Amino acid sequence: MMTRVRSAVSSIIGGIMASGTGAHDSHPDLPLRFPYSRPDFLALSPDEVECSADHISRPILILKEMKLPWATGYAEVINAGKSALNEDQACCEVVELRKRPADPSSVSYTPSRRRSSLPSGDVLDTIHNPEVKELDFHYWALFDGHGGSGAAVFAAKFLHLHIEEQLQEVLEILQDPGLQPPTCLGEESPNPQLHASASGSQRGLSRAASLRGAAGAPGSPNTMAPRFFMEKKIKQESLVVGAIENAFKEMDAHIARERCAYSISGGCTALAVMFLLGKLYVANAGDSRALIVRAGELITMSSSFTPESERQRLQFLAHLQPSLLGSDFTHLEFPRRVTKREIGKRMLYRDFTMNGWAYKTVQEEDLKFPLIYGEGKKARVLATIGITRGLGDHDLKVHDSDIAIKPFLSCSPEVQVYNLCQFEHGADDVLILATDGLWDVLSNQEVADAVSGFLGNCDPDDQHRYTMAAQDLVMKARGILKDRGWRIAGDRLGSGDDISVFIIPLMYGTQQPQPS
């Protein structure tokens, strides 16, 4: 086993390991859940899809016509040969929220479409009730696949439907912006003014009225029981965040169920943005990134989750459940591999409780391969995978072993919130979403400067400028093919990975784009 691990590590050092390697127990005899394709909004023919997979010329694909909400721009390019297909996927939708009669808690419940073709009774009630406010949310998402495109394609089809399903459970609360979410559904939400009035009336009740059980008297059926404990006040924003978090969890479980009947290869990172009730919710599980450029200021809206950034979480899990490591890995981190001749010596190490380093006496068990090995983009979990959050990877194992990787991978996203209504946004203020193929070669500041510089030279009334800016950004990261490979500005190595970019103008969060 150690020989196999050393062989895997030599591949890492050689720089040829992809972010998701190892053994995926695929099921070649099972049918595909969905055929491979590029995003629907690109409207590519089968011939165009085939041409887009040219690893030599690497054509940059953009929108043929402006059809995405908010005049959103999009561009993508395939990798330089890392995988046969572009394993990135993208999705953009406007989803209506309506209460459905189906029971979302049912195990067999699976969202299958965005809108019902025939209105249900609940929907008809909503249509005929003018007091009920209909809601919808705008949705953009990028999925960076590894070990195959199956999980990314599947997540692109379903994640927004799982978010819809979760939001439907709190729809009636969200329809009333002034309503504080009740602690228990079915209870009236506390209203301070109402409580003050009720308490004043209650004090005025006579003892006789109390004994008779008059309405509003203590002990009457219509009186809420007094509470003698503190109760947190939860904001509606937190309900939306919780819905997104649960949707990611349900999406991951959905993949796990469906892979028993269909071939769903690999896993994927997920970066999703939702606009609802004046706020942007940015949810990230993986190493894609989101950032806002507003009046020249750069605002990061996501964190990258890698073996290095999540070292302590991974080490703590391995400490609690050492069986997950098999007999060949240790959860401790050392500056380099420990050798036999160093047994008994004092060596630098780091455990899950530590940000810094300390010395320990090396023991024989420290010769095991470390849970996290390598630095930067070459850091790997169990010598196998370079990301720590995402969807799928249910069958991924350490090469030629039975050690599962999935227990160390989290599907939980980090969700950040940006209130669009708090700021005035101009035509050059944008939200940029991109997979790691872009960020591998360009810093946040370089990306912000490139987009600001490009938009600054465009007609502010030209709504195609955002797609052109996305194309320019992809070109800057891909570079130009030369004798020594793809090169970008400064003769640096260009990105050989798949690259997908959304550029979303923020001013349309409060106003709709007018036709050009």
UniProtKB/Swiss-Prot annotation:
GO biological process, one term: signal transduction
The entry's keywords: Cytoplasm, Hydrolase, Nucleus, Protein phosphatase
Family (UniProt): Belongs to the PP2C family.
GO MF assignments: [pyruvate dehydrogenase (acetyl-transferring)]-phosphatase activity; phosphoprotein phosphatase activity
EC number: 3.1.3.16
Name listed for the protein in its UniProt record: Protein phosphatase 1H
Compartment(s) where it occurs, according to its Swiss-Prot or TrEMBL record: Nucleus; Cytoplasm
Disulfide bonding pattern of the chain: none
Gene3D superfamilies hit by this protein: PPM-type phosphatase domain
Segments for region (Disordered): 102-122, 181-202
Any one cellular-component term (Gene Ontology): nucleus
Pfam families, sorted: PP2C (PF00481)
Top EC category: hydrolase
Keyword Nucleus in annotation: yes
